[in-house]
């Protein structure tokens, strides 16, 4: 196990309650081998899971105007076990873990253990230094790696980039809105001049527009075929 002070330097924090961090790094397999047993990181993991999810939601909400569905998918990808393991390895968190002999003999770098410890660490930071410090640490060690963990396809942006490359414009139109206020369904159409390129449905206007753009892109073998009227049909845009 590396000196925990090195971890604090990496995180750029000055802890007030060292016990919290030692607990965050203590796996239950190690705790159970001690006499008397030490407190493990499972409770901090429970708290940290909520903190990490909140920090990612906070970031996504503040940085974009995307609809709830897209942000939910992005958050799920950014804080899944695979993603948390990537962030943890970048600060070499696996080198600070206290594991029991049995776990060491199995797989010291088990993703689930490392991801859980990452969450426990943020639980400790939050309890010790507060939300704003946890947010600062999160931004420093997570945001640089989001490109590796978030892979939502933004079909509207793809379509817009294709059209803008030829100095043309597209328009979206909501043509149908059904259902009660708490369970709406929208139908959107996307046009290039008078050509209808695609139609899509969704629970929000933006989601329907995404589906319309996706359909437009799926109709052609090559993206630029859209500009040559190979993917659309003429329809008067009202």
UniProtKB/Swiss-Prot annotation:
CDD domains per the UniProt record, alphabetical: DSRM_RNAse_III_family, RIBOc
| GO cellular component terms given for this protein | cytoplasm
Name the Enzyme Commission number(s) assigned to this protein: 3.1.26.3
Q: Which GO terms describe its molecular function?
A: double-stranded RNA binding; metal ion binding; ribonuclease III activity; rRNA binding
Q: Where is the RNase III domain?
A: 4-130
Its catalytic activity?
Endonucleolytic cleavage to 5'-phosphomonoester
Instruction: Give me the residues that bind Mg(2+), please.
Output: 45, 116, 119
The protein's location, in the record's own words, is: Cytoplasm
Query: What's the main place this protein lives?
Result: cytoplasm
Q: Which cofactor does it need?
A: Mg(2+)
Q: Where is the composition biased (Basic and acidic residues)?
A: 222-238
- What are the boundaries of the region Disordered? 215-238
Q: Give the protein family.
A: Belongs to the ribonuclease III family.
The record's function comment reads: Digests double-stranded RNA. Involved in the processing of primary rRNA transcript to yield the immediate precursors to the large and small rRNAs (23S and 16S). Processes some mRNAs, and tRNAs when they are encoded in the rRNA operon. Processes pre-crRNA and tracrRNA of type II CRISPR loci if present in the organism.
Name this protein carries in UniProt: Ribonuclease 3
Q: Tell me the organism.
A: Onion yellows phytoplasma (strain OY-M)
The record's gene field reads: rnc
């Amino acid at each position: 196990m590396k000196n925990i002070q090195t971890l604090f330097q990496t995180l750029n924090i000055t802890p007030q309650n060292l016990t919290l961090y030692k607990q965050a790094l203590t796996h239950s397999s190690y705790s159970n081998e001690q006499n008397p047993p030490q407190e493990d990181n499972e409770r901090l993991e429970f708290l940290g899971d909520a903190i990490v999810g909140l920090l990612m939601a906070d970031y996504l909400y503040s940085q974009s105007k995307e609809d709830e569905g897209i942000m939910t998918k992005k958050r799920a990808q950014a804080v899944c076990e695979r993603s948390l393991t990537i962030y943890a390895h970048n600060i070499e968190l696996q080198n600070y873990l206290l594991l029991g002999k049995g776990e060491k003999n199995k797989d010291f770098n088990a993703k689930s253990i490392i991801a859980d410890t990452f969450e426990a660490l943020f639980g400790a930071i939050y309890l010790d230094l507060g939300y704003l410090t946890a947010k600062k640490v999160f931004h420093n060690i997570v945001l640089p790696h989001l490109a590796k963990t978030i892979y939502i396809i933004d079909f509207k942006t793809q379509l817009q980039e294709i059209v803008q490359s030829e100095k043309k414009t597209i328009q979206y139109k909501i043509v149908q809105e059904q259902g009660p206020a708490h369970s709406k369904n929208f139908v959107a159409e996307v046009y290039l001049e008078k050509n209808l390129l695609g139609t899509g449905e969704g629970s929000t206007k933006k989601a329907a527009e995404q589906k319309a753009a996706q359909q437009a892109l799926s109709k052609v073998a090559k993206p630029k075929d859209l500009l040559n009227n190979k993917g659309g049909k003429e329809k008067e845009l009202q």
